[in-house]
Amino acid sequence: MATKKKVLLKVIILGDSGVGKTSLMNQYVNKKFSNQYKATIGADFLTKELMVDDRVVTMQIWDTAGQERFQSLGVAFYRGADCCVLCYDVNVAKTFENLDSWRDEFLIQAGPRDPDNFPFVVLGNKIDLENQRVVSQKRAASWCQSKGNIPYFETSAKEAINVEQAFQTIARNAIKLEDGLVFPIPTNIQVIPEPQPAKSGCC
């Protein structure tokens, strides 16, 4: 069986500053977590190679700054994305309420070909602080359903809960978009010869 070509996927993680975007990315790629918070300046990315079904996938994960003053950087980073991850902190209501504006911002800046079917994944992070939770799982799931059944995971970058599973889903959804943009070459092409001019001859 012929090996399928390698796939490069661009994934953008969006959300308010402090929700754990960098920590989720580091936990998934490097299996590391740091309690020291350092705000991302502009944008940064890590890559990870993984197998999805029978193909090798290289995922380029972009972690963008949550501060408003960096949102003007959006167009350059959002364009060409194959999946957008919307991240919030289950213990801070405002970070969940801002998901709408992050989603809208992405669709405006990235300008995907088919915005209604563009793959998003929502991550409710910091579930290790369960006693501080203010956004219920039901409320988040309801929001995701209202936006076209966006896949939803509750995660903990600190405890590595659901991080691997979430990024597997992110990769699968991104591949679906990539596959949809590949236009198959029809096999039933007919070549019609050009008509030859009639030869003049003696009667």
From Swiss-Prot:
Keyword Transport belongs to the record: no
Motif Effector region: where in chain: 37-45
EC id: 3.6.5.2
GO molecular function: G protein activity; GTP binding
InterPro entries in UniProt: P-loop_NTPase, Small_GTP-bd, Small_GTPase
Main location: membrane
GO cellular component, as recorded: autophagosome membrane; cytosol; early phagosome; early phagosome membrane; endocytic vesicle; late endosome; late endosome membrane; lipid droplet
Lipidation (S-geranylgeranyl cysteine): C202, C203
Topology with respect to the bilayer: Peripheral membrane protein
Catalytic activity line of the entry: GTP + H2O = GDP + phosphate + H(+)
Pfam families listed in its UniProt record: Ras (PF00071)
Residues engaged in binding GTP: 15-22, 34-40, 63-67, 125-128, 157-158
Keyword hit for Membrane: yes
GO BP, one annotated term: endosome to plasma membrane protein transport
Keywords associated with the record: Autophagy, Cytoplasmic vesicle, Endosome, GTP-binding, Hydrolase, Lipid degradation, Lipid droplet, Lipid metabolism, Lipoprotein, Lysosome, Membrane, Nucleotide-binding, Prenylation
Subcellular location(s) of the protein: Late endosome membrane; Lysosome membrane; Cytoplasmic vesicle, Autophagosome membrane; Lipid droplet
Family that this chain belongs to: Belongs to the small GTPase superfamily. Rab family.
Protein purpose: Small GTPase which cycles between active GTP-bound and inactive GDP-bound states. In its active state, binds to a variety of effector proteins playing a key role in the regulation of endo-lysosomal trafficking. Governs early-to-late endosomal maturation, microtubule minus-end as well as plus-end directed endosomal migration and positioning, and endosome-lysosome transport through different protein-protein interaction cascades. Involved in lipophagy, a cytosolic lipase-independent autophagic pathway.
Protein name stated in the entry: Ras-related protein Rab-7a
Species this chain originates from: Dictyostelium discoideum
